[in-house]
Regions:
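Catalytic alpha/beta core of large soluble enzyme barrels
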Residues: 58-59, 71, 263-366
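Conserved active-site neighborhood of enzyme catalytic/cofactor-binding cores
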Residues: 42-73, 175, 332-362, 427-436, ...
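Conserved oxyanion/phosphate-binding beta-strand-loop segments in alpha/beta enzyme cores
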Residues: 1-36, 66-75, 99-106, 282-323, ...
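A generic structural motif
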Residues: 231-235, 312-314, 573
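Nucleotide/phosphate-binding sheet-loop regions of phosphoryl- and nucleotidyl-transfer enzymes
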Residues: 182-184, 194, 252-281, 377-380
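Surface-exposed helix-capping loop/turn segments at secondary-structure junctions
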Residues: 20-25, 70-71, 114-119, 145-148, ...
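Residue patterns forming the tRNA-binding/recognition surfaces of aminoacyl-tRNA synthetases
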Residues: 2, 15-19, 91-241, 248, ...
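N-terminal catalytic cores of NTP/NDP-binding nucleotidyl/phosphoryl-transfer enzymes
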Residues: 25-94, 100, 123-138, 245-246, ...
Length: 646
């Protein structure tokens, strides 16, 4: 008889559910396998075939491991806090809770129709109080251990979403959520000191099985560099302008300095700067620009010389001008740089525009035409003259800096501390109380979760303040430390919070005493294999490794790294080879494929599209080919069983 996928799909999916066929066992004598996929954000659009490809690979691995006798944990959940849901709720006059529940129901229906072997008894939802209680608990632990701080600073701000964005969430000068232009705004920001874990995150990569491209992206994101901190005296003062450089060997070629327009020394010595009006105007222009706009390499170089303020090159003793320019940022390095125009393209362009001296210190190019950025013999460099090995010349300069007390070897990171707050409603409330007497005080652990109040108006204020700031019953409270009048923090956590530890909650999803039982953690950790998208191998993967390593350091988890192995599937493109998009009308709904060809056909096709790690276009013709293959397989099975099908 002909293979009837509708009958077969329902039959086996019902049997699996009735028998709890995919529930992880409590038998810890069996070898374990923890297979993890990135849990989805339950958007109103529902799942797309990209989700199916992401999950189908791990699905095959987990089914094989079960056949081999492993105790398999293959869970699923929903990363449900976040701005898209809130924006949709505002637009459609609904509550985010209602939107979230509706979307999760739809996602569950889709996932079950495809027949994935998830353990549904361990499903988590990051918006449930029983879950975000422990998200807040981990934040409190970080606060107690000095990894949380608050600072007023210029931030990336989305006027459309009315929310502060991290650098990671505003790449290209665009909001990662709504894609509108980002502006700079001064705000109080909560930060997590992820930079304190930079070396541990790098060292941890030596202990895990990550593909070379994923490891490289993580290393580049953290961006560890070794160089030197050097002090340049400001002429006529006792002040030192401290810079960081990875090329201390080129100090003889420094002919000017550049400071960030926000540098505090500008205001400190304003009375010495004769063109302060021009400086003030330029600073005002810079304040309107986003970080992306300020740091683009291809843009025209702009700046203003600080007339009346100059620096002394500590190696040559020569007086050199100080400029301010928008491409130098206070949040990077020290907020000032030394400029070696002969051997840096950006410095070269700047020097040419402003008529600044260019001194060649590395032989090999023609500096009358362009900067020379290669290696070569050191020239015009005093005690370094004749050196041809860059490493040797750097080491000799480091020795000299130390001997003279004008600098020292140092390390810097490209990664910055993690901006960790949003001025929106649909997120985890930050469990901090502000007391006039005691300062910032953590909400007591026994009072967690700090619940998100149920409100009717959850739109942010025009000034960008959180909707929670308008709820007096939430804001006004007593200080947990002194008992005096205090106010609760009204910002919420970013969407990245809940996804930074969800793999731990799967292990013991219903425990209300701890986020997971230590014995369960000991058995199941680390995750044996984690598969997800390449778009998450920096932010999410680094953030979750950071949270896990912190929990390891305070004795809450038994492993230093959360994931033993990581892989990434390629994107499923539209039939025209372009990324699937509603606006382009090339999105494929998995429900449509299941209706027409069956769940097995869909899962088979996404596994045979090509190299699993590469992008591939959708092909209806190939889907039909997979259906014919399964028809022949079913016919062969029937023939072997003697049912007469030929």
């Amino acid at each position: 008889m002909k293979y009837d996928f509708k009958v077969s799909d329902k039959k086996w999916q019902d049997i699996w559910e009735e028998q709890g066929a995919f529930h992880a066992s409590s038998d810890k004598t069996k070898p374990k396998f923890y297979g993890l996929v990135e849990f989805p954000y339950p958007s109103g659009a529902g799942m797309h075939v990209g989700h199916i490809k992401a999950y189908s690979g791990m699905e095959v691995i987990c089914r094989k491991k079960r056949m081999q006798g492993y105790n398999v944990l293959f869970p699923i959940g929903f990363d449900a806090f976040g701005l898209p849901t809130e924006n949709y709720a505002i637009k459609n006059n609904m509550h985010p809770r209602e939107v979230t529940d509706k979307n999760i129901t739809h996602f569950k229906q889709q996932l079950k129709r495809v027949g994935f072997s998830f353990d549904w008894t361990r499903t988590v939802d990051t918006t449930e109080e029983s879950y975000y209680k422990w998200t807040q608990w981990i934040f409190r632990k970080m606060f107690d251990h000095g990894l949380v701080f608050r600072d007023k600073t210029l931030v990336n701000y989305c006027p459309s979403c009315k929310v502060v964005l991290s650098n990671e969430d505003s790449q290209g000068g665009k909001c990662d959520i709504c894609h509108s232009d980002v502006v700079q705004k001064s705000k109080d920001v909560w930060y997590l000191r992820i930079t304190e874990y930079a070396d541990k995150l790098l060292e941890g990569l030596d202990t895990v099985d990550y593909p070379a491209n994923i490891r490289m992206q993580q290393e580049n994101w953290i961006g560890r560099s070794t160089g030197a901190f050097v002090n340049f005296s400001i002429s006529g003062t006792d002040e030192k302008l401290r810079i960081y450089t990875t090329r201390p060997d080129t100090l003889f070629g420094v002919t000017f300095m550049v400071m960030a327009p926000e540098h505090p020394l500008i205001d400190k010595y304003a009375d010495r700067i004769s063109n302060m009006d021009a400086v003030t105007d330029y600073r005002a222009e810079c304040a309107k620009k986003t970080e992306f706009e300020r740091t683009q390499l291809v843009k025209d170089k702009t700046g203003v010389c600080l007339n009346g303020l100059s620096a002394i090159n500590p190696i040559t003793g020569k007086e050199i001008p100080i400029y301010i320019s928008d491409y130098v940022m206070m949040g990077y390095g020290t907020g000032a740089i030394m400029a070696v125009p002969a051997h840096d393209e950006r410095d070269y362009d700047f020097a040419k525009k402003f008529g600044i001296d260019i001194v060649e210190v590395i032989k090999g190019g023609d500096i009358s035409k362009e900067a020379y950025t290669g290696d070569g013999e050191m020239i015009n460099s005093g005690f370094l003259n004749g050196f041809t090995n860059k490493k040797d010349s750097i080491e000799r300069m480091l020795e000299y800096l130390s001997e003279q007390g004008i600098g020292e070897k140092g390390v810097q990171y490209k990664m910055k501390d993690w901006a960790f707050n949003r001025q929106r409603y649909w997120g985890e409330p930050i469990p901090i109380v502000h007391c006039p007497k005691c300062g910032m005080v953590g909400v007591p652990y026994e009072e967690l979760p700090l619940r998100l109040p149920d409100v009717k108006n959850f739109e942010p204020g025009e000034g960008g303040e959180s909707p929670l700031a308008k709820i007096e019953s939430f804001v006004n409270c007593k200080c947990p430390k002194c008992g005096g009048d205090a106010k609760r923090e009204t910002d919420t956590m970013p969407q990245w919070a809940g996804s930074s530890w969800y793999f731990l909650r799967y292990i013991d999803a219903h425990n209300d005493k701890v986020f997971a039982d230590p014995e369960e953690l000991k058995y199941w950790l680390p995750v044996d294999w984690y598969n997800g998208g390449m778009e998450h191998v920096t932010r999410h993967l680094i953030y979750s490794r950071f949270w896990h390593r912190f929990l390891y350091d305070i004795g809450e988890v038994p492993t230093a790294e959360p994931y033993a192995k990581r892989s990434a599937q390629g994107m499923v493109l539209g039939a025209n080879g372009v990324k699937m998009s509603k606006s382009l009308g090339n999105v494929v709904d998995p429900n449509d494929v299941v209706d027409q060809y069956g769940a097995d056909t869909l899962r088979t096709y996404v596994l045979f599209m090509g190299d699993y790690g590469s992008a591939a276009p959708w092909s209806d013709t190939s889907v039909k080919g997979c259906r014919r293959f399964l028809d022949r397989t079913a016919a062969l099975t029937d023939m072997i069983k003697g049912t007469g099908v030929t």
